[in-house]
Amino acid sequence: MKTKSTCAQNPNCSIMIFRPTKEEFNDFDKYIAYMESQGAHRAGLAKVIPPKEWRARQSYDNISNILIATPLQQVVSGQAGVFTQYHKKKKAMTVGQYRHLANSKKYQTPPHLDFEDLERKYWKNRLYESPIYGADVSGSLFDGKTQQWNVGHLGTIQDLLEQECGIVIEGVNTPYLYFGMWKTSFAWHTEDMDLYSINYLHFGQPKTWYAVPPEHGRRLELLAKELFPGSSQGCQAFLRHKVALISPTVLKENGIPFGRITQEAGEFMVTFPYGYHAGFNHGFNCAEAINFATPRWIDYGKVASQCSCGEARVSFSMDAFVRILQPERYEMWKRGQDQAVVDHTEAMGPTSQELTTWRVIQAPRKTWGLKHLRLRQVSRCLLPVATDSNIANNTQMCHTSRQAADSKGDEVQESDPAIAPPYPLGLSSPGHMSTGKRGLGRRPCELGVQESTNGAPVKRRLPEGRDDRSPSPELQSQSVTGDLIVNSDLVNPGPQHPVTASEGGLTSDP
């Protein structure tokens, strides 16, 4: 019997802050389930402050030579709190060079009284002095000795993507680093395949986040289509291009509920399935992020919308997740008769049948570990991007009973925004091949242009058969000192720690 229930907690969809004890911090899956039992998922975003004894990395003194292969200058057009963000590819630079640039007079954080004052300056001056973002740097800064909440090895059901299908998509099931400066931004979006994500701010200045509760996500999509009519006509899921910036003032004026919160160094942010989020950096900083999954996500993955124009499409097979964790629905799903209905208020208990099944099959596989890219300090060119033919060949490992099943669709029942009706089967029905294009947008070199692009860089699928723990033959590289990835042994946490709602709370028109 599944321990799913409609969560009565957090009816206001406030962004919650969690402070787990050292014991609670030992079991990632169980603590995420606990957070959802408290209603954290209803906000679409939550903050987790690690125990004071915990450290991600002992020292960041040796990272200045890490290469940012494709820094992106974020150029904005628009007015009155509604902007489109374009990206211009810049020359490669090291983290040390980027830090110097971020702290220069041209790009440094302006004087401000508090976070609210800085936020006003951000939206008032967004059109001026285009910042440069060091985004999508493959690798991890977590020490090998860091076992708890090491984003490079969370041990969630997302591991099935690599273990069952041999699929590795950079930034989805391998970590990415993001080096930011004042005003660098991430536009409104949900995660690819509507996965969860986790973001750890290693060091530097804070990051402000905005989030729309999943049960109100459809309202944001409808507003975005009105504000960006050209983009919406060109792609039914154009928000996946990650180019639309909408200010909190505009959201308020249009009655869109949202929350806001500021992440500081040493804190985690967790986004939940179909949770739209956006934000900006206060100054030079470094964050690390990756996607992950829980059994509650599976039905989201089945119906996740897809970019219809191919600009930022990421899809992969849902077969392994349904076959292994929802065996009673597998045959029906293969016939296209499993019309998933997503309830955004639903919570998955920490003792759910799917989670128990995952732990049983996970135990003998833990010694495998996940493969990850090491950080590059010297680079001659970018990693090759898989072509459509390469992608097709890569996914043959998941044929017959392992066909892709990523559904698309946008309609949500307006009478009850918390319930999403069945989505039409289409490109992501069983039998559709997986693709792996993602990121802030598509890289300029993939679009055939030299300077700018409407989106931002695509997260790359690694070439078939490549052991990404080893350097690519195209790269002359040296790893950062110390192991970056480690297997973690999960143990059950003790009694759960009290939580609080964020100061920002949820904002909407009265």
UniProtKB/Swiss-Prot annotation:
UniProt modification remark: Ubiquitinated via 'Lys-63'-linked ubiquitin chains. Deubiquitinated by USP14 with the help of TRIM14 leading to stabilization.
Region of interest (Disordered), residue spans: 397-510
Binding site for Zn(2+): C235, H241, C307, C309
Top-level lineage group: Eukaryota
Biased composition (Basic and acidic residues): 461-471
Family: Belongs to the JHDM3 histone demethylase family.
Protein name as it appears in the record: Lysine-specific demethylase 4D
